Amino acid sequence: MYFSRDDLLQKETETLAPYAISNANNGGRIYEEEEHSYRLPFQRDRDRILHSSAFKRLQYKTQVFIFSVGENYRNRMTHTLEVAGLSRTIASALGLNSLLSESIALAHDLGHTPFGHAGQEILSGLMKDYGGFEHNKQSLRIVTSIEKKYPNFPGLNLCRETLKGLMKHGADYDSSVILLERKENGPSLEGMIADLSDEIAYTNHDIEDGWEMGYLHLGDLLENPFWKEVYEECKDQYKEVGEKILIRTSIRTLTNFLVSDLIQNIAHRLEKKQIKSTEDLALLWKQDFRIASFSKEVDLKFRELKSFLYEKLYRHEDLIRMSDYGKKIIESLFDYFLKHPEKIPDTYKERIEEESLYRVISDYVAGMTDRYAEKIYQSLP
């Protein structure tokens, strides 16, 4: 049996909720293309992101534990895949377009620098007088212009709805990207879900990786009421298991708890506000009402857990020292290429006349992996 694009579109209309973004209403692409015979628009977006050079490099970019060696610790790619999985689950449970949520999730970290948030912090400072640097905006730059894989257009030419999902509220974006509608009507519910899935994923895997690496201990974790509540519940249920299995079980339970609360609370709000269309969602956005959120009780617990991790994990002296080293590498590379622009690869150098030297260096350095940046740094004269 063969399902054509039209068959798939018809099947989609039978399963999506009325407030979901359908493939038939994807907003189009900036550069017109012929539709694929058996792939839907958001499927093509997902595949283009997965096959992009920027996505491949995510496996060699770290988030929190810079320069850590170990096969079991997360990197940007494993984090992204976890976010995509959560996004699919939540979107499907709510009758939303899981392909769109997945595509947004897969692209959300493409613009991250090497060396995690330390890299963004130093690059943002270096670029503050030259247009700035912010990883969400950089993700948009990658998929709209920096990636070079197609003969008829720059970037990946993703659907506008996918691009809108990469825009963060309050950020200043270039209007030439033709995405002003996002500022007025807000993100899709699929995009909001990808954002919240990101929060769930990084919080839980930072707990696991921090514990695995010895930066967090059970005694530390039990200081947080939310963790203690989940851990004690698992301990009562699994009395015969050891501490390691119990901690891993608690992390899974915490993830499931947050996902379930989010799904139930969004469903409750959709029903309470009688949401019947994407227009209804846009109206609520203009009224500053966020339909996608945890319940008040869980939201408070989750915020406290994230604050706890900031104090107990992210400010650990070892992590700060590694972050400082990452910043030193990026600052040194930036300064070197400013003084020696001839050393910039030709694929970047040819854009200097169209954009500033600062922007080209920023794009080049931001696209490096951790180990490539360190390798270039160590080879500097």
UniProtKB/Swiss-Prot annotation:
It comes from the Bacteria. It holds the Pfam family HD_assoc. InterPro entries: dGTPase, Diverse_Catalytic_Enzymes, dNTPase_2, HD/PDEase_dom, HD_domain, PHydrolase_assoc_dom. Residues 76-203 form the HD domain. The keyword Repressor does not apply. Keywords: Hydrolase. This is Deoxyguanosinetriphosphate triphosphohydrolase-like protein. It comes from Leptospira interrogans serogroup Icterohaemorrhagiae serovar Lai (strain 56601).
